[in-house]
């Protein structure tokens, strides 16, 4: 796939000279974030109460209570500025954990369907209970390992997938791209991406029918923690060889394998 390889080389070469300079409006600029305006006051209140409970339950660290909005809720809602959830679209939240970014996005975009996937039943029980409290009819919680889920009926059925804290980019690519329909996008919020990791992700994407499309500033990052979103695109159908069996993507990431053979 020469087009995919050219794209990977172009992107990583541009990034290797240093991350681009942006002026980004952060969620802490001014008294309130623009992302909160996508919610009604009642929805914002319910979300804040839900994630205060998530802190108490240990799904978020104790220090997060004071920065729920700027580090978590605004951060989740701001993804819609990069890729707006459209009515009837299917979004997958990979390794959903405490439902971030999926639950806040589902509140703000009730015509879009969100599937929250996690291997830990306790977290998913909380996500389901919270979705019920928020009166969300557009949320489904799936208890599964992504390696198995990506080989089932949901394969290549999603328009967009998000992965907030799933692992290194090559691992995220292998677990996420098989779930996307051709033309879909995988959004991966990060801190400042490492050039080597981006190169490995680009190599992994070549094998998975995708490419690393762009690295864009995360407009909702707090001012003291500038972040980016890595965007991977699904170009052609993924080979049935992927994802590999449970645990293998994390132990032997695709991009690292290819990189070591150079």
Regions found by a protein language model. Give the residues of each.
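Class I SAM-dependent transferase core
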Residues: 3-92, 122-139
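Short "lid" loop at the C-terminus of a central beta-strand within the Rossmann-like core
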Residues: 147, 191-195, 220
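Short strand-turn motif at the edge of the Rossmann-like AdoMet-binding core
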Residues: 119, 166, 189-193, 217
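Short alpha-helix immediately C-terminal to the canonical SAM-binding loop
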Residues: 123-125, 194, 198
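Short glycine-/small-residue-rich Rossmann-like dinucleotide-binding loops
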Residues: 165-166, 236
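Helix-to-beta-strand junctions that scaffold the AdoMet/dcAdoMet cofactor pocket
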Residues: 180-182
């Amino acid at each position: 796939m020469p087009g995919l390889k050219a794209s990977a080389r172009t992107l990583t070469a541009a990034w290797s000279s240093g991350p681009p300079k942006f002026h980004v409006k952060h969620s802490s600029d001014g008294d309130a974030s623009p992302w909160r305006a996508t919610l009604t006051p009642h929805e914002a209140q319910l979300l804040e109460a839900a994630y205060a409970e998530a802190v108490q339950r240990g799904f978020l660290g104790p220090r997060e209570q004071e920065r729920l909005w700027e580090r978590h809720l605004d951060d989740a809602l701001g993804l819609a500025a990069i890729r707006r959830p459209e009515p009837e679209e299917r979004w997958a939240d990979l390794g959903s954990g405490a439902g971030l970014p999926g639950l806040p996005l589902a509140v703000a975009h009730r015509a879009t369907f969100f599937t929250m996937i996690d291997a830990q039943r306790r977290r998913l029980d909380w996500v389901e209970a919270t979705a019920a409290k928020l009166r969300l009819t557009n949320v489904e919680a799936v208890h599964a390992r992504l390696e198995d889920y990506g080989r089932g009926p949901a394969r290549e059925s999603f328009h967009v997938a998000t992965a907030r804290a799933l692992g290194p980019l090559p691992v995220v690519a292998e677990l996420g791209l098989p779930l996307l329909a051709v033309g879909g996008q995988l959004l991966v919020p990060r801190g400042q991406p490492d050039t080597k990791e981006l190169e490995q992700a680009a190599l992994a994407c070549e094998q998975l029918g995708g490419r690393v499309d762009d690295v864009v500033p995360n407009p909702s990052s707090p001012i003291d923690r500038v972040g980016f979103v890595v965007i991977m695109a699904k170009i052609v159908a993924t080979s049935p060889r992927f994802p590999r069996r449970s645990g293998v993507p994390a132990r032997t990431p695709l991009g690292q394998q290819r990189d070591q053979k150079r």
